[in-house]
Curated annotation (Swiss-Prot):
Protein purpose: Type-I myosin implicated in the organization of the actin cytoskeleton. Required for proper actin cytoskeleton polarization. At the cell cortex, assembles in patch-like structures together with proteins from the actin-polymerizing machinery and promotes actin assembly. Functions as actin nucleation-promoting factor (NPF) for the Arp2/3 complex.
Modified residues (Phosphoserine): S369
Stretches with biased composition (Basic and acidic residues): 9-27
Protein name: Myosin-1
Region feature Disordered, mapped onto this chain: 1-37, 958-1093, 1135-1227
Pfam families (alphabetical): Myo1_CA, Myosin_head, Myosin_TH1, SH3_1
Annotated binding of ATP, by residue: G141, E142, S143, G144, A145, G146, K147, T148
InterPro entries: Fungal_myosin-I_SH3, Kinesin_motor_dom_sf, Myo1_CA, Myosin_head_motor_dom-like, Myosin_TH1, MYSc_Myo1, P-loop_NTPase, SH3-like_dom_sf
Post-translational events: Phosphorylation of the TEDS site (Ser-369) is required for the polarization of the actin cytoskeleton. Phosphorylation probably activates the myosin-I ATPase activity.
Recorded name of the encoding gene: MYO1
Compositionally biased spans, kind Polar residues: 1150-1161, 1216-1225
Domain IQ, first and last residues per copy: 731-751, 752-777
Domain Myosin motor: 48-727
Annotated spans, Actin-binding: 416-498
Amino acid sequence: MGQSKRPFKNKEEKKSRGFGRSRHDDAGAGGRPQVKKAVFESTKKKEIGVSDLTLLSKVSNEAINENLKKRFEHGEIYTYIGHVLVSVNPFRDLGIYTDKVLESYRGKNRLEVPPHVFAVAEAGYYNMKAYKENQCVIISGESGAGKTEAAKRLMQYIANVSGGTDSSIQQTKDMVLATNPLLESFGNAKTLRNNNSSRFGKYLELQFNSVGEPVGATITNYLLEKSRVVGQIKNERNFHIFYQFTKAAPQSYRDAFGIQQPQSYVYTSRSQCFDVAGMNDAADFNETIEAMRIIGLRQAEQDNIFRVLSAILWLGNMQFQEDDHSNASINDQSIIDFVAYLLEVDAEGVQKALTQRIVETARGGRRGSIYEVPLNTVQATAVRDALAKALYFNLFDWIVQRVNASLTAKGTVTNTIGILDIYGFEIFERNSFEQLCINYVNEKLQQIFIQLTLKTEQEEYAREQIKWTPIKYFDNKVVCQLIEDKRPPGVFAALNDACATAHADSGAADQTFVGRLNFLSQNPNFESRQGQFIVKHYAGDVAYAVEGMTDKNKDQLLKDLLNLVNSSTNSFLHTLFPNRVNQDDKRRPPTAGDKIKASANDLVTTLAKAQPSYIRTIKPNDNKSPSEYNVANVIHQIKYLGLQENVRIRRAGFAYRQTFEKFVERFYLLSPKTSYAGEYTWTGDAESGARQILKDTSIPPEEYQMGVAKAFIKTPETLFALEHMRDRYWHNMATRIQRAWRNYLRYRTECAIRIQRFWRRVTGGLEFIKLRDQGHKILGGRKERRRYSLVGSRRFLGDYLGISNAGDMGDVIKSSINISSGENILYSCRCELLVTKFGRSSKPSPRLLILTSRNVYVVVQKFVNNQLSILAERMIPIGAIKFVSTSNLKDDWFSIGVGAQQEPDPLISCVFKTEFFTYLTNALRGQLNLRIGETIEYNKKPGKLAVVKAVKDPAVPRDDVYKSGTIRTGPGEPANSVSKPTPRPKQVPGKPITKGKLLRPGGPGGGPSKLAPRPKPVAQNLPENPRAAKQPAGEKFKPVAQSVTAVAAAHARTNSGSQNRPPPPPPPTQPPAPKKDTAKALYDFDSGRSNELPLRKGEIVQVVTKESNGWWLCMNLETSAQGWAPEAYLEPIVAKTPSLPPPPPSLPPQSKSAVSNTLPNGPSRVNGAAAKAKPAPPAPPFKRPDINRKAAPAAAPRDSAVSMNSHESPAGSGRATPSSLSNASIAGGLAEALRARQSAMQGKEQDDDDW
């Protein structure tokens, strides 16, 4: 029925209509429906009237007219009647056919967008692709109502959305669009009602392949008004091509064909109308030439076309006058010669064909005598006009055939979309044979509309036993029978009989025709009057003049003219007139009425094979005014178009009907009982399958009815919902497949990662283990080892500071100390450098030690003007290193012997010294001179060698302590010790390969997942003595740390028995909430910055975050405003320590064995853990953080146990150094230091001064 079956575009629209909801759609958080937030649509255009006439509160012709008028006045020219589009000609450009508007209709059903011809095109194209059914669009309405424009817009839309990037497909699209300007030039003309009136009918059939790409097209033309070639009424014009050609012909054509302006030719000047408002003939001529090029007409073919047009124009200038015998003669011989030149025939033959007629007499079936009968001026003029009309008519037919040849399908044709653009219904002051044929074809189209939308629909409801209230309508079948029937004879039959009876005399034939019409006087739709007859058409009563009808019906060219054309040497003329004159053929040739009737029936048959869509065009006024709306004329069109009846049937009818078999075939995916994984599984009959589908999709019973063989859907919204659910099924299946595939890919990735992780664990760490073992060999059993150096999990990782990591602190350090990109970072670690200070003892100071493939860097970090500065304190090329010296004890000190003339050798303490030796050895390709002895040698000053003694002292609490040139360290592991085996990792339960729900346990190919039922609780018999309870197999007892009091109390309760059990103690009280830090403002503070908190003296604020850079993040207790405040302006408020609770009561004496059995080593572990205190985190850089950024967490301590603190103080070094001068004044401290130096240097040389 041409109904658009395009689904809803989004879920919200579908759900708003109540279709296809899942049980999860109505429940959100807490089980409440999720209601979409309302948004004011300020840009939405307010609807004028109703966009669908079925929504009118009152159905009448006046109500329909009022709605159309209201919409017309506001520029809304399109309105629906269900799926029928009503279009009112605006006579102006509304800007509604742009590419942007076109794209807005792509992929939308008609309910989602305003009424438009693009929506009809989209529905037809979608239905063709989705249902594999041929489609057609029937455009009807009177002349000037906008049928041709609607057809052009349909072609525009289909060409844009039909896809296809292949060059041949694009060429087909271009050629189809090019047919519009070409055929309009040759088939359209200006009339009183329409400046671009189609004077022929056209059925364009677009051909598509299986994927919806256009592969070809065919055009069938009907009823070309060839009489317009030789005459027009005032203020009308000939066909457009004559004015385009005469105004814009190139000079070559003017010279070859003698072309002049249109005022010079009788056929183009008779009506004295040469120009049309809003039309540029010269520009249109160029567009016509371009269309010919696109379609593929060669230059020779174009030349022949314009040669024939020139001959027609010059034929019209051939005037006749009477000679002495009252016979016709041509007064201008030059015109005869030029016409003969254009037709490429003999000039004498032209003169004879136009002024004489050859008559042949027959006797007894034999050929008789042949006479040359001269013609009078009237007869000669008629022969001239007949030749001109025949030339143009055959030329037009040839152009259509040539276009079809270019548009021949270049692939397999699967489906078609037809567009019918034909004459509208015509009623003039004088109506002749042309109007009878045109109105007859419109009656046939109206009959199709009635049969498919009114009669057939109601008959189908009755046949299918659907509840239905019949609606009365006018069936125009009787009018069609009046014109076309043979028994009893209709108008065409009577006309043919008159032509056959009195074929020689036109006047006698017309009178015979009038006599035959008297037999039709009993028909209620026919009236006969003097010299005319009236037919009561569906669009109104039309009076037709009898005069000249028989001649027009004969539609025969005189044999004299055919002989003239056949004598031409121009092969193109022979192509235009392919039928040779058969002198012996006695059969009556088909008349014009016969041809029209056959064409109309063929058209009806073609349309019946397709699913039709309808566009009903309405002309608002006869003056082509963009503002005038003639109510009387519009109501007349509403009546004869049957819009009121169409509205009533659409309101009471069903939007969609389909056989049970096709319905189930289309929608079986929507029910789990009729399909599984896309496969059809229904085993019952088709009717029950259709009912099951409608039931499972929650379609209300009032929205459908089940007939005898078909399912009927009432509203298009229901159909759109079904289509949307069907489309979403495939989307959901695709999503499930994608989810399964992504899950499988994730599974494979996780498996690969596990394998890679295991392989790296096995092989990736071997390199670092080899380096560690190489370190043992480098030491060569000459140095005692620390226990940490020998643990099995120790690896020589090298770059502990991450200097080589991009985008991290490493980039900052590399750029600060100018490490080139060609240097590979081999080793980096924190260390301490022995630094000599004037007037003070040498002390270790924190540094960074970096080894590259070229240099050794000693990097210092310090604050300069409250900014962290990173400097390369020392850069030593590895080639300049003469030796590395270290002691034979377990201390971490070593020196790098360079022997520079300006700088001393560095003496460094680094916990990863052996690793440094290893990487340095590799960098030097094994040429490192490693000196290991009881002392460490180094140049304390340039050119002055000094030694540092290493002394073993078991009393040293830490690894080693440096003081006054001596390193004291505890005993270490034997020098020949090697690393212990790598410990096996802790056995933990294996994690699942993936968290996906679509994979079986163990990955693809595993056994099916079966959920074990949850066991029900069963009463168990517990032993009286809890100690006797047996531990489960494989589960070890884990002691829990408890206080001695609790253990003793538990032991006492266990031995006391169940009869004298004391009451349970009260539940412990909730621990107090942690108190928030507060501070009191000592001074007023108001900087005016947005990220700083103003303070008033004495004000109490809450401290949120304390930064070590001198700024605290505080919050005002009254306004809750947060901001940064200087630490110096605040005094923390220390909360009073609450008094300790009284000690617990003493316990009864317990045996040691009981306590030890209950909790082995429990108290000692607790106390030991509490005794160890974590080291303080390093201070962050001095930078005030932004208020919107979280404070940086404190950095975790490194494994090296070397502080990051860059302040050169004893506390920063972490070493045991003298601190007796820390609390003295500067002068006093200096004097005391000098006295200490003097006593320490007694008996020593000046070079041994460490102070």
